[in-house]
Regions:
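N-terminal export/assembly segments and adjacent metallocofactor-ligating motifs
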Residues: 1-231, 260, 268-269, 356, ...
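Long, contiguous, secondary-structure-rich segments that constitute the structural scaffold
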Residues: 458-460, 464-505, 581-592, 599-695
Length: 695
């Protein structure tokens, strides 16, 4: 007998609906749900193999207490009660001794409702040091565009869209659910332009591909703005009536040297002019940006400049152009940004989070600030913390510094599915349940909400949101966790509880027509009520009111190349390296280089290469030739570690991990706390006596 359970994949925020088939031997298999209006039954490889996470023999199933030194991977099993009691005792002692802010809380990539629960615990503990990945994922894009347009625009891609610019994004790999609309527009004649150092799916199929120097995006955006203004190609009516600061922007670009900007990108003026004309002449056009534009210190201003391009072209809130978000969410607390949670601590107090960036809306502590406080005690000491569903040993900048910082902590707790390099640095490790192991609520990409069914219990693992609440209760600062109350709060916008949602299975979001030209009646949600080409608010924060291009880190004779990174379609950041079905598809970290560079450095395909950004910053990855790359650009894999190495070198966290190469230096213009990831000056050469592990 084959039992089918319809539920939702929780590996990313897309929320693909899946059918889990269970036979009489309790063996599971996964297929996409063809009734899902977003995916139509399609599913990525990670989702197809998600059951392997739940059933993996190396899952953490009991609370663990460290017995050896940090990183030695020596533990004893303890009860949940002992774990919670010891955590509460240590956390309370830390705050009583060193102050409320000596305790930090860190979460990772979007995990529905869990990150908000951690924010609530931080609020209850009166600590401003809540940390997430936003400085290099989402915040630069969101706030850069909001400071300009008053909102973060979507893309109304349909048969009316005449031009699509893919900028630092590969939807084919990372958000395949959007490809249906993209392909529909292309079939109806849309011109496509791809801005990316490597030949992605979009670049391969584009009408124009701009393989710019990694990290030179702001130079390209400012070159396009200058061309549009110099040639008077902008939408004169929209700019005159609905934009603030055009004369200041015009004066600014008058001073720019187009040849210099083009050279910084290693693109011809002719190519930049051609694609700018294609974009500006389209009746309706969209720019789709990706995570790559969140990655460098200038990322906020990159997104400001792109929003300015959207405005100059007049593609705001028109059919087939950039769209305004609309409608209210059917759930509460899915993301840790809701005012009722954020405002529990005043903005004035939140500004004291360590490393807090100048942009006040980005109130969280930064990884750079946390590490500096752990190591120096400045501006105050960070002594203990709770890390939930993230792996800072691979995801924070300067992995060696992360280890040094964690070694200074008095007490560290990690909630995880597996023993990661970060978990090995903890004092207590708590076993987290995968999304298959608890009943709950999920939200799809279209805004619809769904009941998430539980398949089975694995050991004594618990859902992260419950773990967080139980820690808060043990500390005496949160009520006893009640599952019904938790989900009823999440479902408060639709006024039902979890059992009622289970009976309904799903509540579909209303299909609303895209708003067009709403600014005619309500303006834009900015101080001037217009699109802010010049931002007085940024000026008052002593930040650039108009985007200013500053060169990336300079190349040198020793480091003449530039390295950037890209995500694998087979993994979620550092997650999944122990899943054999995924590892078989991508067994080793890959660095892509031009064959001419390989010949120059005596490297062949399959060789292990050393990638170096400083004498003490070297990683090793397997060479693959890609002659579509510029000869001085290399693309290295992201977030690698080797679970099969166990405690040896923290599961190989320093062998191939890209963040060994990065630093906590954010330069002089990191408005939002982003650090250098794209375009690091480097060298590459053949490694000796290095073998990379594979399972």
């Amino acid at each position: 007998m084959n039992n089918v359970i319809t539920t939702t994949c929780g590996l990313c925020s897309t929320g693909c609906r899946i059918n889990v088939h269970c036979n009489e031997h309790n063996q599971y298999s996964i297929k996409g749900d063809k009734c899902d209006p977003v995916t139509h039954g399609a599913l990525c490889k990670k989702g197809l193999h998600a059951i392997d996470i739940m059933l993996h023999p190396e899952r953490l199933t009991q609370p663990l207490k460290r017995t050896g030194k940090r990183g030695e991977d020596q533990w004893i099993t303890i009860s949940w009660q002992q774990a919670l009691d010891e955590i509460a005792l240590k956390f309370n002692h830390t705050q009583n001794t060193f102050g409320d802010n000596s305790l930090f809380f860190s979460y990772g990539y979007s995990k529905d409702f869990i990150n908000t629960q951690l924010l609530k615990l931080a609020n209850a503990a009166n600590s401003v040091n809540i940390h997430g990945p936003e400085t290099v994922c989402w915040a630069p894009s969101k706030y850069g565009k909001e400071y300009t347009l008053g909102y973060n625009p979507g893309a109304d891609i349909n048969q009316h869209t005449d031009c699509i610019i893919f900028w630092g994004v590969n939807k084919h790999n990372t958000r395949f659910t959007e490809m249906r609309a993209i392909n529909h527009a292309i079939e109806h004649g849309a011109t496509t332009i791809c801005v990316d150092p490597q030949q992605t799916h979009h670049a391969k199929n584009a009408n124009y591909w701009l393989p710019l120097v990694p990290g030179s995006d702001l130079a390209l955006a400012m070159a396009m703005i200058k061309i549009i203004i110099d040639k008077a190609w902008y939408d004169t009516v929209f700019v005159a009536d609905f934009c603030y600061g055009f004369s200041a922007l015009q004066s600014h670009v008058d001073q720019l040297d187009l040849s210099y900007l083009a050279n910084e990108c290693q693109l011809s003026i002719e190519m930049i002019t051609d694609i700018t004309q294609q974009y500006i002449n389209a009746k309706s056009a969209v720019i789709i940006t990706g995570n790559a534009l969140d990655h460098n210190p200038d990322s906020f201003q990159v997104n400001r400049a792109i929003a300015i391009l959207m405005a100059l072209s007049g593609n705001i809130e028109i059919q087939g152009g950039q769209s305004k978000p609309q409608g209210k969410s059917l759930v509460n607390g899915r993301w840790p940004y809701d005012p009722q949670d954020v405002d529990q601590i005043s903005p004035t107090i939140r500004q004291h989070s360590v490393g807090s960036p100048p942009i006040p809306e980005s109130f969280r502590a930064t990884s750079q600030g946390l590490m500096d406080a752990m190591l120096t005690g400045q501006p105050y000491s960070i002594k203990a913390g709770l890390i939930v569903g993230t792996n800072p040993m691979t995801s924070w900048p300067d992995s060696n510094k992360v280890k040094q910082a964690f070694e200074q902590l008095d007490f560290l707790v990690v909630s995880e599915l597996f023993m990661t390099p970060t978990a090995m640095m903890a004092d207590i490790v708590l076993p987290a349940a995968s999304f298959f192991e608890y009943a709950g609520v999920t939200q799809g990409q279209d805004g619809s909400i769904h009941y998430q069914a539980s398949l089975q219990q694995v050991g004594d693992a618990k859902p992260d949101h419950q773990i967080i609440a139980e820690i808060g209760h043990a500390m005496g600062i949160m009520p006893v966790y009640n599952d019904n109350d938790f989900w009823k709060s999440a479902l408060s916008p639709v006024n039902i509880d979890l059992m009622q949602l289970k009976a309904q299975t799903s509540i579909l979001a209303a299909v609303e027509n895209q708003q067009t030209l709403s600014y005619l009646s309500v303006g834009f949600d900015t101080p001037s009520r217009k699109v802010e080409l010049y931002s007085q608010k940024l000026h008052e924060l002593t930040l650039d009111p108009i985007p200013v291009y500053r060169p990336n880190l300079p190349i040198t004779d020793r480091y003449p190349l530039r390295v950037t990174t890209a995500k694998s379609r087979h993994y979620m950041f550092s997650h999944g390296r122990q899943i054999s079905s995924l590892r078989a598809k991508h067994p080793l970290p890959i660095v892509k280089i031009h064959s001419s560079l390989g010949e120059k450095e005596h490297l062949k395909e399959g060789d292990i290469a050393a990638i170096e950004t400083a004498p003490d910053k070297i990683i090793y990855q397997r060479v693959k030739f890609d002659d579509n790359l510029n000869i001085d650009t290399i693309i290295a894999d992201l977030s690698w570690w080797f679970p099969e190495m166990k405690s040896k070198q923290l599961s190989g966290a320093f062998i191939s991990n890209y963040n060994v190469l990065t630093t906590t230096d954010t330069g002089t213009h990191s408005d939002i706390g982003s650090f250098y990831i794209n375009g690091l000056p480097c060298r590459i050469y053949k490694a000796t006596n290095i073998e990379l592990s594979t399972i």
